[in-house]
C-alpha cells in the first residue's frame, strides 16, 4: 500500500527509459538499415550474390535471438527488482514493528528497572535495619560479656578471701547458683534477640509481599486503564457515527430548506402574477356584471322585438320555429357538461339571435338560467352588437364580445380580462389545483360538480367570470353556469326576421348601452376605488389579511369555542360529540371548500395574496352590489326581466358573500398549508360559521374593523399573544422533548404536559416573542413559509389525521380537566385569557410566531435530542431515536391537538395547561426515577470518572431529598432532580434550560425563601449562593410572575455577598485540585438544600415552576460549581420544576454531557452539547452557553486552581455581568417564567443564573479536567512536540515514497482515519484527547499530555494505518484538490460550506441570523458573532447563524489558523494564554469559543485547531468525510487534523455545537464569561467581540499536524518527490 505511488512512479520512469532506449535503438537500426540498403544496392549492382544475402539473414536472425534473450533477461531483472522492492517493503514493515516492539520493550525495561531499583532500595533499607540490629545485638553481647566477666571476677574474689583452713567449702553452692543465674539471664537475652530478629525477618517478608502486591496492582491498573481506553474508543466511535447521522440529517434538512425556499420564491412569483390577474379578473367581472345588466335589458328588447316581429310577420312557421327552439330549455340546461358542450351552448345563441323569443322570460325567471343572463346572453348579445353572425368557433365569442363590448359597454380592460383570460385561467387552474389538490373535488353545495366543469371547460367568458372569485357576481354566475349551461342550446333556430331584429336590436342596444354605460361607469368608479384600495392595501393587507382572517376565524372560533366551552363545562361528556360534530362540519365545509376551490382554482394562489384584498373588496363588493341592486331594481322595474335580474344580484350578493367566505376558507386552507397545518380546525370553524354567516357583508366589514383593531392590539399586545403562542410553542416543543424520552406516555399526558409547559413558556417566551413579535409579524410570510413549508408539509398531513385522533383524546381529557382547570385557570386566564383571546384573534401571529420558533424547536429538538441522546449512550440513543420517531409524530399530533385546543379557547388551553401541570408533576416523579435510572445506567457506562460516581451519589441523595421534601414538592424535585441529573449530564443543558425558562429568575427569587428551608443541610452556603445568584440575576429586577421578587437584598449588594459565600465554600470544597472529593460534600450538603429549597420554592405552582428553576440553577451554580453532581441535582430540581420535558431533553443532553464528563474531552463536548441544547431551547442555549462559557472560563483558568480561578472568577465575574441591567438577551427573556414584565431584570436574573450556570459549567469543566487529569500545559506542549517529532520520525520512516506527507503528518495528530478516509474515532479519551485534547487540552492546559501520549501512540498506529490508507490518501490526494474543503481551499470552502448552512434563514427564524445568509457575512459575521457572542444568531439553533458563525469563526479562526498554516492548534492555553484569552475583552462567546476551544476544544479552537490540523494536513481526507459532509464541520475540520470526531463533532458540534457554541457562545458569550476576560455583561459580547480576536492573542504553537498544510496537489508533489527520492 505504502509503496504504490513509489512503484508507480518507478514503473513510469522505467517505461520511459525503455521507450527511450527503444526509440534510440530504432533510430540506430534505421540508420544502419539505410547504410545496409545502400551497400546492398551497390552489391546488387556489382553482383547478385545470394550466398551473401543468406549469410546476412542468418546474422540478422542471430541478432534478433540475442535481442530477445536480452529482453528476457531484462524482464527477469525487473521482476527480481520488483520482488526485492516488495521484500524491502516487508522488511520496512517488520522494522517498524521491531521498532515499536523495541520501544515497548524499552518501556518495559524502564519499568522493570524502576521496579528493580525500588527492590534495591527496599533491600538496602532492610539490610541497614539488619545491620543496626546486628550492631545492637553485638553491643548487648559485649555488655553481657562485660557483666559476666565482672561477675566472674567477683566470684574469683570470693575464694581469695581468707577462708578458715579447715572450714567446709561453703561458697561453692553460691557460685554455682550465680553461674546458673547468669546463664539463664544470658539465654533469656539471646532468646529475646532471636525473637526480635525473627520478627524483623517476618516484617521484611511482609514488606516484600506488599511491594509485590503493589506492583501487581499497578499492572492491573494499567490493564484496566487500557480496557477503559478501549471502551472509550468504542464509545467515541459510536459518538462519531451518531454525529455522522446527525450531520446527514442536517444536510437533509438544509436541502429540504433550500427546496422550500425555492418553492416559496416560485409561490411569490406566482402570487405577484396572480395579483395582477386578480385585478384583471375583478375588472372583467365588473364588466361582466355590467354586461349582464345590459344583456338583461337586451332580453326585454329581444322579447319586444321578437313579439313585434312575430306579430308583424304572422308566419306560423317562424312562430313554430321559435317556440320549438325554446320548448324545453330546461332539458338542455344540463346538456353541456363538457367544455365543448358549454362552448357550443354559448355559441349557439350567438349564431341564432332570433331564437330568443317568449320562452326566454321563463328561463330567465327561473333561478337556474340566471347564469344565462351572464354568459348566454353575453354571447347572444354579441351578434346584436356586431350585427353580423359570428362563425361557430369556440374562441369566436370572446373576441367578438370583446370588440363589441369594448365599443359600447366595456372599458378596454374587459377585452384584456376576457381575451387574456383565455390563456390565463387554465394554467392558473392547474396551479391552483396543484396548490389545493384536496379541494378540487366537487362538494355537496354544488350540483354534480358543475362548478368544477365551469372552471375547467368554460369559454373565456366563463373563465372571466370564474377567475375573479372576489368579484360580486362570481359565485352566482358559476353556480348557475353549470345548471344553465344547457339553456344556451335553445337558440339553435333563427327567426326569419333576423335582419329586422338586428336593426331593432342595434337601436335598443345603443339605448341599453347608454344605460349600461352609466351603470358601468358608476360600478367602475366604485371598483376603481376598490382596486386602488386593494392595491394600496395589498402590502399592509397581506400582512393584515392573515391577521384579519385569523381574527375572523377566531371570531367564528370564539363562537365555536364559547359553544364548545359551554358544552364542555355543561356537558363534559358531550364535548367529544360537539368536537366530532365540529370535525364533521369541518369535513363538510372542507368538501364545500374543495368544490368552491374548484371554481376558484384559478384564483386560489391569488387568494393567498387576495385575502387582504378580499376584505376591502368584500366591503366594496357589498357596497357595489348594493348599488347594483338598487340600480338593477330601478332598471329592471321598467323591464320585463326586472324580477329575474333583481333576483340575480340578490343571489349574487349572497353568493358573493359565500364565495368570499369560501375564498377565505380556501385561503385559510392555504394558510393551513403555509403557516399551520393545524389551521384546518380553524378553517373548519370558519367554514362552519360562514354558512351561518352567509350574509357576512356587514360581518366582513366588522371583521375588517376588528382586524384593524386586532392588529393594533396585536402590536400593542404582542407579548400577550406571544404568550399564548409561546405556550403553544413550548407546549409543542416540550411534548416533543418529553415524548422523545417518554414516548410511551399517553397522548393525554403529553397534552397535559404541553399545556403545563405552555403556561410556563408562555411567560418565558412572551418576553422574547414580544420583541420578536414585531420582527416575526413583519415578515411572517417569509419566516413562516420556509420553516412552515417543510414543517407543515411534514406535519400537516399527519396532523390532520392526528388532529382528529387528538380531538378525541382531547375531548376525553378536556372533559376531565375542564372542571378542575376552569377554577385554576380562571385566575391565570384573567391575564393570559385576554392575551390568549387576542392571540386567538390573530392566528397568523400564532402561526408565524409559533412556527418559526416552535416548529424550529419542534423540528430541531428531535434533531437536537437525537444529537444529545446519541451522545448519552448508544442504547439510550437507539431507544431514544425510536421514541423520537414515534413521538415526533405524537408530538405533531400534540401540535395538532394544541392548535385545536388553542383554537378552542384560551380557557381550555389554560385549563389543560394546569391539568398538564398537575399530571406533569405526577409524571415528573416517574420521570425523575426514569431519569435517575438512565443516569445511573449512563453513570455505570461512565464509571471511569469520579464525576459519574458523585453523580450517582447525588442522584441517590436527590432521591432521598425528594422523599424528604413534601409530596407536592417531591414531584417537582424528582423532576428537578431528574432534570438536574439530566442537566448535570447535560450539565450545561439543564442550566441552559433553566435559564431558558427564565424560571431561573423566578427560582432565584423563590429559591431565596427556600434558602431557609429547614431540610437544606447547607442553608447558609446555599443562601449565600442563592442570594448571590438570585441577587445577581434575580436582584436585577427578576421578579416571579407572581411578583415574587423574593430577592433577599439589593441586587447589587447581595450579589457580592452571595458570591463571596458561594465562592468561599466552593473554594474550600474545591481546594482539592480535582474538587471532586470536596465537591461531593458540597454537593451532598447543597443537594438537600437544593432539593428542599426547590421544594420549598415549588409550593406555588408559579413559584415552584419558576422559582425552583432558579434555585436549582443558583444552588447548582453556586454549590454545584465544586461538584458536578450538585449541578446535576440542582439542575434536576430546577428543571424538574421547569418540566419533565427538560428532564427528557436534559436527559439526552445529560447523557451526552455525562458520558462526556468522564471523558477528558467532555469539556470540548460540553459546548456542542450546549449548542445542541441551545438549539433545542434558544434561551436555554444561553443558559448552557453561560455554563460552557464560564466552564470554559473555569477551564480557562488553570485546572490546578479550578475553583478559585474558575468558580470564584465565574461567580465573582458573573455578578457584574448579571448586575449589568443592559442584558437584552431576548432568548433568556423568553425563558423568563411568567409574564415577568421586568424583561431586563429577568434577563439579568437569567444572566445571573446563567452566570452561575457558567460558573458551574466551569466548575464542571474544571472538575472534568481535573477528573480527566489535570495535566500542566507545559507537558502538553512537550507532549505535542514529542508527538510531532515522533510523528515526523514515524512518518519519515513509514511514509512510502508515494504517500503524500500531508496525510502522514496529519495522521499522528489527526485522529484516526478510517480506511474510507473518514477519521477513525479514537477511543473517547483519544478522541477527546487527540481531536480535542491536544488542541483542546493544550488550550485547556490540562489533559494535553495524556492526549499527546495517546496521540503519539495513535500517531504510530496511524502511521501504520496511513500506510494502509496511502492508496486512499493518494486517491484523496488526487481528489482532494477538487474537494471543496481541501486544505489549500479550506479557507474558501469553509467560508463556502457555512454558507449552505447559513443560507437557510429558516434556521434563524427570528431573522437574527440574516447576517449569516451570505457566506462572507457568515464567515465575517460568524467570527464577529462568535466573538460578539453571536447575538445576531444568539437565539438561533439555525445552522445558518450558529453554524455559520461557528463555521465562520472556525473558518475565520481557521483562516487565522490557516493563515498560520503551521499553527498546530495544540495551543497550550497556559494560564497566561488563558489569561490572554480570558483577558481579552472577548465576550462570553469568545471565551466560549476560546474556552471551548481551550477546555472544550470548544469546537472553534479545538475544532478549528484540531480541525485545522485535519484541514491543513488531513484536510484532503477530512474534507471528503467531514468538509463535504459537514460543510460546517469542514470549516472547522481543517485545524490540526486532530479532531477525527471533530469532523463529526465539529459538524455536529459545528452544526450543533457550532450552533451550540455560536449560540452557547451567543448566549454563553452573552453570558458574560466575566471570569474569563472581564467580559462584562453578555452584551459586552459585541463590544468584547469587537475587541477580541478570535484567538484573543492566544499564542498558537505549531502542532505536528500542521507542519504541512497540503492542498492535495502539494501532497501529490511531495509524494512524487518522495517517490523520486
UniProtKB/Swiss-Prot annotation:
Description of post-translational modifications: Constitutively phosphorylated. This increases during mitosis when the cytoplasmic intermediate filament network is reorganized.
Phosphothreonine found at: 315, 338, 388, 851
Summary of the tissues where the protein is detected: CNS stem cells.
Region (Head): 1-7
GO molecular function: CCR5 chemokine receptor binding; intermediate filament binding
Biased composition (Acidic residues): 1275-1292, 1409-1428
Subunit (UniProt): Forms homodimers and homotetramers in vitro. In mixtures with other intermediate filament proteins such as vimentin and alpha-internexin, tis protein preferentially forms heterodimers which can assemble to form intermediate filaments if nestin does not exceed 25%. Interacts with FHOD3.
Protein name per Swiss-Prot or TrEMBL: Nestin
Lineage: Eukaryota, Metazoa, Chordata, Craniata, Vertebrata
Amino acid at each position: 500500500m505504502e509503496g504504490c505511488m513509489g512503484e508507480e512512479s518507478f514503473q513510469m520512469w522505467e517505461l520511459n527509459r525503455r521507450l527511450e532506449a527503444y526509440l534510440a535503438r530504432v533510430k540506430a537500426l534505421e540508420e544502419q538499415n539505410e547504410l545496409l540498403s545502400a551497400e546492398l544496392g551497390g552489391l546488387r549492382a556489382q553482383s547478385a550474390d545470394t550466398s551473401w544475402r543468406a549469410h546476412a539473414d542468418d546474422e540478422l536472425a542471430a541478432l534478433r535471438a540475442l535481442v530477445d534473450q536480452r529482453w528476457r533477461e531484462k524482464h527477469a531483472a525487473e521482476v527480481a527488482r520488483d520482488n526485492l522492492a516488495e521484500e524491502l517493503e516487508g522488511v520496512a514493515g517488520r522494522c517498524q514493528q521491531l521498532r515499536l516492539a523495541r520501544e515497548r520493550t524499552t518501556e518495559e525495561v524502564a519499568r522493570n528497572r524502576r521496579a528493580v531499583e525500588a527492590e534495591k532500595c527496599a533491600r538496602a533499607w532492610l539490610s541497614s535495619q539488619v545491620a543496626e540490629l546486628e550492631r545492637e545485638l553485638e553491643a548487648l553481647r559485649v555488655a553481657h560479656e562485660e557483666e559476666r566477666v565482672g561477675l566472674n571476677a567477683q566470684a574469683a574474689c570470693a575464694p581469695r578471701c581468707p577462708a578458715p583452713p579447715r572450714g567446709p567449702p561453703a561458697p561453692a553452692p553460691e557460685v554455682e547458683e550465680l553461674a546458673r543465674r547468669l546463664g539463664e539471664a544470658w539465654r533469656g537475652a539471646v532468646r529475646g534477640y532471636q525473637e526480635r530478629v525473627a520478627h524483623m525477618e517476618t516484617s521484611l517478608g511482609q514488606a516484600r509481599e506488599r511491594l509485590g502486591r503493589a506492583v501487581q496492582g499497578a499492572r492491573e491498573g494499567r490493564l484496566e486503564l487500557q480496557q477503559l481506553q478501549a471502551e472509550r474508543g468504542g464509545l467515541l466511535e459510536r459518538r462519531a457515527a451518531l454525529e455522522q447521522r446527525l450531520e446527514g440529517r442536517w444536510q437533509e434538512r438544509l436541502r429540504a430548506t433550500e427546496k422550500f425556499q425555492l418553492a416559496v420564491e416560485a409561490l411569490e412569483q406566482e402570487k405577484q402574477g396572480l395579483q395582477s390577474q386578480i385585478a384583471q379578473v375583478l375588472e372583467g367581472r365588473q364588466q361582466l356584471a355590467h354586461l349582464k345588466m345590459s344583456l338583461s335589458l337586451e332580453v326585454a328588447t329581444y322579447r319586444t322585438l321578437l313579439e313585434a316581429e312575430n306579430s308583424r310577420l304572422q308566419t306560423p312557421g317562424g312562430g313554430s320555429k321559435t317556440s320549438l327552439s325554446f320548448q324545453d330549455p330546461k332539458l338542455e340546461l344540463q346538456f353541456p357538461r363538457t367544455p365543448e358542450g358549454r362552448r357550443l351552448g354559448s355559441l349557439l345563441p350567438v349564431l341564432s339571435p332570433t331564437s330568443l323569443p317568449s320562452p326566454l322570460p321563463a328561463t330567465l325567471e327561473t333561478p337556474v338560467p340566471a347564469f344565462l343572463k351572464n354568459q348566454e346572453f353575453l354571447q347572444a348579445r354579441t351578434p346584436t352588437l356586431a350585427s353580423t353572425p359570428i362563425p361557430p368557433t369556440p374562441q369566436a365569442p370572446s373576441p367578438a364580445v370583446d370588440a363589441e363590448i369594448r365599443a359600447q359597454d366595456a372599458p378596454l380592460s374587459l377585452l384584456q380580462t376576457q381575451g387574456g383570460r383565455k390563456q390565463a385561467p387554465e394554467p392558473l387552474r392547474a396551479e391552483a389545483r396543484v396548490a389545493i389538490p384536496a379541494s378540487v373535488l366537487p362538494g355537496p353545495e354544488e350540483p354534480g360538480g358543475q362548478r368544477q366543469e365551469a372552471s375547467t371547460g368554460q369559454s373565456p367568458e366563463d373563465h372571466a367570470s370564474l377567475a375573479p372569485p372576489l368579484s360580486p357576481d362570481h359565485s352566482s354566475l358559476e353556480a348557475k353556469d353549470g345548471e344553465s349551461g344547457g339553456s344556451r342550446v335553445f337558440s339553435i333556430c333563427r327567426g326569419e326576421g333576423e335582419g329586422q331584429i338586428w336593426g331593432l336590436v342595434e337601436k335598443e342596444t345603443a339605448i341599453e348601452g347608454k344605460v349600461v354605460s352609466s351603470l358601468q361607469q358608476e360600478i367602475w368608479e366604485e371598483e376603481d376605488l376598490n382596486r386602488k384600495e386593494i392595491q394600496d392595501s395589498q402590502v399592509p393587507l397581506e400582512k393584515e389579511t392573515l391577521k384579519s382572517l385569523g381574527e375572523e376565524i377566531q371570531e367564528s372560533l370564539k363562537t365555536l369555542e364559547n359553544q364548545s366551552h359551554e358544552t364542555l363545562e355543561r356537558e363534559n361528556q358531550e364535548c367529544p360529540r360537539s368536537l366530532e360534530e365540529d370535525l364533521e362540519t369541518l369535513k363538510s365545509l372542507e368538501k364545500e371548500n374543495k368544490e368552491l376551490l374548484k371554481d376558484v382554482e384559478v384564483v386560489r394562489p391569488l387568494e393567498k395574496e387576495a385575502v387582504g384584498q378580499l376584505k376591502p373588496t368584500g366591503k366594496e363588493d357589498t357596497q357595489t352590489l348594493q348599488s347594483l341592486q338598487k340600480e338593477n331594481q330601478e332598471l329592471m322595474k321598467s323591464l320585463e326581466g326586472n324580477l329575474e335580474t333583481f333576483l340575480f344580484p340578490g343571489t349574487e350578493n349572497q353568493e358573493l358573500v359565500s364565495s368570499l367566505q369560501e375564498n377565505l376558507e380556501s385561503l385559510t386552507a392555504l394558510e393551513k398549508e403555509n403557516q399551520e397545518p393545524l389551521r384546518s380546525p380553524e378553517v373548519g370553524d370558519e367554514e362552519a360559521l360562514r354558512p351561518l354567516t352567509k350574509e357576512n357583508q356587514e360581518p366582513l366589514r366588522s371583521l375588517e374593523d376588528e382586524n384593524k383593531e386586532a392588529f393594533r392590539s396585536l402590536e400593542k399586545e404582542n407579548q400577550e399573544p406571544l404568550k399564548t403562542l409561546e405556550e403553544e410553542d413550548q407546549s409543542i416543543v416540550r411534548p416533543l422533548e418529553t415524548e422523545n424520552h417518554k414516548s410511551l406516555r399517553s397522548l393525554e399526558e403529553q397534552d397535559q404536559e404541553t399545556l403545563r409547559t405552555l403556561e410556563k413558556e408562555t411567560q418565558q417566551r412572551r418576553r422574547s416573542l414580544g420583541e420578536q413579535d414585531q420582527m416575526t409579524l413583519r415578515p411572517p410570510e417569509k419566516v413562516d413559509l420556509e420553516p412552515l413549508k417543510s414543517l407543515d408539509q411534514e406535519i400537516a398531513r399527519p396532523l390532520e389525521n392526528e388532529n382528529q385522533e387528538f380531538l378525541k383524546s382531547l375531548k376525553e381529557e378536556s372533559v376531565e380537566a375542564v372542571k378542575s382547570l376552569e377554577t385554576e385557570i380562571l385566575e391565570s386566564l384573567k391575564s393570559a385569557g385576554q392575551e390568549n383571546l387576542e392571540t386567538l384573534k390573530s392566528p397568523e401571529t400564532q402561526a408565524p410566531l409559533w412556527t418559526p420558533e416552535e416548529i424550529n424547536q419542534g423540528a430541531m429538538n428531535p434533531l437536537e435530542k437525537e444529537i444529545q441522546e446519541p451522545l448519552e449512550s448508544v442504547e439510550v440513543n437507539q431507544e431514544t431515536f425510536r421514541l423520537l420517531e414515534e413521538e415526533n409524530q405524537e408530538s405533531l399530533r400534540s401540535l395538532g391537538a394544541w392548535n385545536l385546543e388553542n383554537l378552542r379557547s384560551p380557557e381550555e388551553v389554560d385549563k389543560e395547561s394546569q391539568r398538564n401541570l398537575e399530571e406533569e408533576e405526577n409524571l415528573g416523579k416517574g420521570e425523575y426515577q426514569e431519569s435517575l435510572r438512565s443516569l445511573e445506567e449512563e453513570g455505570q457506562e461512565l464509571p471511569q470518572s469520579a464525576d459519574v460516581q458523585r453523580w450517582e451519589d447525588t442522584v441517590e441523595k436527590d432521591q432521598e431529598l425528594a422523599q424528604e421534601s413534601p409530596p407536592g414538592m417531591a414531584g417537582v424535585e424528582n423532576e428537578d432532580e431528574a432534570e438536574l441529573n439530566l442537566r448535570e449530564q447535560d450539565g450545561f443543558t439543564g442550566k441552559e434550560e433553566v435559564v431558558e425558562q427564565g424560571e431561573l429568575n423566578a427560582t432565584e427569587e423563590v429559591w431565596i425563601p427556600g434558602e431557609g428551608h429547614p431540610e437544606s443541610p447547607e442553608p447558609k452556603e446555599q443562601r449565600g449562593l442563592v442570594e448571590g445568584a438570585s441577587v445577581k440575576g434575580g436582584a436585577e429586577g427578576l421578579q416571579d410572575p407572581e411578583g415574587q421578587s423574593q430577592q433577599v437584598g439589593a441586587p447589587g449588594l447581595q450579589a457580592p455577598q452571595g458570591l463571596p459565600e458561594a465562592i468561599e465554600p466552593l473554594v474550600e470544597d474545591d481546594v482539592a485540585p480535582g474538587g471532586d472529593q470536596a465537591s461531593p460534600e458540597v454537593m451532598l450538603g447543597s443537594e438537600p438544600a437544593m432539593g428542599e429549597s426547590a421544594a420549598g420554592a415549588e409550593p406555588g405552582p408559579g413559584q415552584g415552576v419558576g422559582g425552583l428553576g432558579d434555585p436549582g440553577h443558583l444552588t447548582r451554580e453556586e454549590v454545584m460549581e465544586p461538584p458536578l453532581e450538585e449541578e446535576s441535582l440542582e439542575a434536576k430540581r430546577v428543571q424538574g420544576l421547569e418540566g419533565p420535558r427538560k428532564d427528557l431533553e436534559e436527559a439526552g443532553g445529560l447523557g451526552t454531557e455525562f458520558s462526556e464528563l468522564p471523558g477528558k474531552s467532555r469539556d470540548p463536548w460540553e459546548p456542542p452539547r450546549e449548542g445542541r441544547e441551545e438549539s433545542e431551547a434558544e434561551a436555554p442555549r444561553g443558559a448552557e452557553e453561560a455554563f460552557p462559557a464560564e466552564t470554559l472560563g473555569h477551564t480557562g483558568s488553570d485546572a490546578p486552581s479550578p475553583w478559585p480561578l474558575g468558580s470564584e472568577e465565574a461567580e465573582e465575574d458573573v455578578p457584574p455581568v448579571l448586575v449589568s441591567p443592559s442584558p437584552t438577551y431576548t432568548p433568556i427573556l423568553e425563558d423568563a417564567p411568567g409574564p415577568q414584565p421586568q424583561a431586563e431584570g429577568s434577563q439579568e436574573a437569567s444572566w445571573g443564573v446563567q452566570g452561575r450556570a457558567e460558573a458551574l459549567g466551569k466548575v464542571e469543566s474544571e472538575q472534568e479536567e481535573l477528573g480527566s487529569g489535570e495535566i500542566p500545559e507545559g507537558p502538553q506542549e512537550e507532549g505535542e512536540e514529542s508527538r510531532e517529532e515522533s510523528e515526523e520520525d514515524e512518518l519519515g520512516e513509514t511514509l512510502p515514497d508515494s504517500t503524500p506527507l500531508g496525510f502522514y503528518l496529519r495522521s499522528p495528530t489527526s485522529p484516526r482515519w478510517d480506511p474510507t478516509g473518514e477519521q477513525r474515532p479514537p477511543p473517547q479519551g483519544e478522541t477527546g484527547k487527540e481531536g480535542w485534547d491536544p488542541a483542546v487540552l493544550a488550550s485547556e492546559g490540562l489533559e494535553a499530555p495524556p492526549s499527546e501520549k495517546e496521540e503519539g501512540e495513535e500517531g504510530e498506529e496511524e502511521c501504520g494505518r496511513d500506510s494502509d490508507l496511502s492508496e486512499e490518501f493518494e486517491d484523496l490526494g488526487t481528489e482532494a484538490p477538487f474537494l471543496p474543503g481541501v486544505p489549500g481551499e479550506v479557507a474558501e470552502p469553509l467560508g463556502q460550506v457555512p454558507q449552505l448552512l447559513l443560507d437557510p434563514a429558516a434556521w434563524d427564524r427570528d431573522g437574527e441570523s440574516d447576517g449569516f445568509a451570505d457566506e462572507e457575512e457568515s464567515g465575517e459575521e460568524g467570527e464577529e458573532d462568535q466573538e460578539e457572542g453571536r447575538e445576531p444568531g444568539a437565539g438561533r439553533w439555525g445552522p445558518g447563524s450558529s453554524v455559520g458563525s461557528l463555521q465562520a469563526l472556525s473558518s475565520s479562526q481557521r483562516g487565522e489558523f490557516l493563515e498560520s498554516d503551521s499553527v498546530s492548534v495544540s495551543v497550550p492555553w497556559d494560564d497566561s494564554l488563558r489569561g490572554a484569552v480570558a483577558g481579552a475583552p472577548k465576550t462570553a462567546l469568545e471565551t466560549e469559543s476560546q474556552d471551548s476551544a481551550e477546555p472544550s476544544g470548544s469546537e472553534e479552537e479545538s475544532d478549528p485547531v484540531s480541525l485545522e490540523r485535519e484541514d491543513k494536513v488531513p484536510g484532503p481526507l477530512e474534507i471528503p468525510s467531514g468538509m463535504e459532509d459537514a460543510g460546517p464541520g469542514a470549516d472547522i475540520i481543517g485545524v490540526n487534523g486532530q479532531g477525527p470526531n471533530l469532523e463529526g463533532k465539529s459538524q455536529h458540534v459545528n452544526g450543533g455545537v457550532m450552533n451550540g457554541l455560536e449560540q452557547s457562545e451567543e448566549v454563553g458569550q452573552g453570558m458574560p464569561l466575566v471570569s474569563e476576560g472581564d467580559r462584562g455583561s453578555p452584551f459586552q459580547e459585541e463590544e468584547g467581540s469587537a475587541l477580541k480576536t478570535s484567538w484573543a492573542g492566544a499564542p498558537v504553537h505549531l502542532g505536528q499536524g500542521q507542519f504541512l498544510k497540503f492542498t492535495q496537489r502539494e501532497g501529490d508533489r511531495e509524494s512524487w518527490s518522495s517517490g523520486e527520492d
